């Protein structure tokens, strides 16, 4: 039996007002500020503040990847199968996740005094798993960009600006930590907990406010279907496989990301100065997205993504050579350090492509699947891609602490040293290698599957036009 969906406005008209656009971008900014803090600093908190050993860190990273993924199997079936009312498909889920995410962010950087051993690991893993689960609901704030307008040009504009705002928001915690580090220089634990509290409060307020101000305007066929069939539709789509393989390879860069705060301490003396790594990269990412938006008017998105992978390998190799020369000279300051930070900006330019274009590819694949099957699989597509990124991400997360520190590690990082410049030369160079060259190799490999991707240009426009006609056959009467 077919359900009812909200009415779809004319697809060739501008749909999104200025206030709605701004509110949406603000909510995305503070959402990615929260997720960015976990991504940037949680490992640093566990290694240098809580001081868990490398085997505990590997176990933690494995559990917080695998367990949420298993639970998400059921969550995404609920998301894609739920009835659509006046408030839309995704907005209620973001509002549901806002408060728990803010609280869990705080708990991610707070450990009760006296906890050790098994109780400590249970506490850490429970919070990490709950964070991963709630983030599945919260992440639907990104899905909202795809359904705010049926106008293809307007949709791509929202996706582009969402990517830029996400890149900046992802670096916001770096600024907060730097400021707190100037006030409480030798108290990392306090820096982390204050940053988490501030970021959590702002995330809650803006996610709730942003969802009240936005609308969803895509018409859906609401007939209930077996969600497992939807997974099969995705796995049978050849274009989806281009994205799946690419994202699988790209997720191995988690090893490089893991090294970031530790390398910043080795180069600059303190992990709170990771801002000087993250900010140039974040600015480069935002600039890179603007460049990509301009180049999309002249070049195929597939070609741009492949070219960005080649560029990433070149830029990261250049950064490694600069950093290697600096460490070998054992210089305490000087121009090489500045040149290295400039190279981080150049590396960030590639992030503009790797963050923006896959979102556009996924939006186009969603339309291809919907045209062929009549099913809208927003959450399920991300989940299927996530199956493979979970595998590579879990491997990367488990290997990262074993590579960084402990017995038989490659880098030989020593925990608890306040001045990171006192780490050995071997440690610095190996961390630098994984942060730069290894990252560049994975980004190059991530572009290879797109040699076989054809859903661009005229083919993309043809599918979108046919889909707009198909949506006219849906029951467009509004329903609570």
Task: Name the predicted role of every residue range.
Residues 3-480:
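Membrane-embedded alpha-helical bundles of multi-pass transporters/translocases
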